[in-house]
Each structure stands twice: as structure tokens, then as C-alpha cells.
Regions:
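Charged docking surfaces used in two-component/phosphorelay signaling
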Residues: 18-26
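Short hydrophobic/Thr-rich beta-strand motif most characteristic of the beta2 strand and flanking loop
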Residues: 28-35, 43
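Acidic catalytic/metal-coordinating carboxylates
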Residues: 35-36, 62-65, 83-86
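Short amphipathic alpha-helix used as the core "switch/output" element in two-component signaling
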Residues: 42, 64-76, 93
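Active-site residues of response regulator receiver
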Residues: 55
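Receiver (REC) domain active-site loop signature in two-component systems and cognate sites
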Residues: 58
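C-terminal output helix
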Residues: 89, 107-117
């Protein structure tokens, strides 16, 4: 039996998780979605995720702090940063602190699926579904 990829999505905009959760589940990935960074960090403390997708700008805790906490717990976890406020400086900081990739909003679910697929391959996961949604 093949090991399932475990992925956490953290974005304080509810629509993001509602769109991305099902899109990534179609790939055969086990997805947990959070809007509250405190709850997400608690869950990250309880379970090691293979991939974490986090927004950078959130209230209370920013995505860079989430990135640092994830990497401190498990260096193998691939962290994908998403933001509507993309700048070269923010991208450089995130990548410099160990982010796997950086995606600027707005993006299509297929864009994220492609990055997740690359992250999964980097972790040694094979056979993820490359589902392409026709209207995304």
C-alpha cells in the first residue's frame, strides 16, 4: 500500500481553502484546511505534514512565522507560500528561509497542483494523479 501525501492548507480567506482543498484532494492527497493560523500551528505540532501551503499575510501570525515553525519541527516538509502581496523582497525572504516555492495570487488551482506535484516528487512520492480541471 502506497503512503498517502499529507498536506495542510492555511489561508485566512475561507474561499481559498474551499477551492483548493477539493482541487488537491483530486490528486489523491489527504488535505486539512485551516483559516486560523493558531489552530493550524497546533495541528502542525500534533502531526507532521509532507507539504504545507500557507498564505503570507494573515492577522496575528504571518506565513513567514508559520514557515519557520514548520521547518523547525520537520526540515523535510515542503512549504509553499501564497500571497496577494507578492514582491521580490517577500519572495526572497520566504525562499531564503526554506520555502519550496512561492505563488502570487490570483492563481488557478492547476497552478498550485503543479507546484504540489513537484514538491511531492522532491519528497520521493510517485504516482500522484495529475488531474487537470477543465474550467480552472
Amino acid at each position: 500500500m502506497e503512503k498517502k501525501l499529507h498536506l495542510l492548507i492555511l489561508d485566512d480567506e475561507p474561499i481559498v481553502g474551499k477551492r483548493l482543498g477539493p482541487a488537491l484532494s483530486k490528486m489523491g492527497v489527504e488535505v486539512e484546511v485551516f483559516e486560523d493560523p493558531h489552530q493550524a500551528l497546533k495541528r502542525i505540532g500534533e502531526k507532521t505534514f509532507d507539504i504545507v501551503v500557507t498564505d503570507i499575510r494573515m492577522e496575528d501570525i504571518d506565513g513567514i512565522e508559520v514557515l519557520e515553525k514548520v521547518k523547525a519541527k520537520s526540515d523535510h516538509t515542503k512549504v509553499i507560500m501564497i500571497t496577494g502581496y507578492a514582491t521580490v523582497e517577500v519572495a526572497r525572504e520566504a525562499l531564503g528561509k526554506g520555502a519550496f516555492d512561492f505563488i502570487a495570487k490570483p492563481f488557478k488551482p492547476n497552478d498550485l497542483r503543479e507546484v504540489v506535484h513537484r514538491a511531492a516528487e522532491a519528497l520521493g512520492f510517485k504516482g500522484l494523479s495529475r488531474v487537470e480541471a477543465s474550467r480552472e
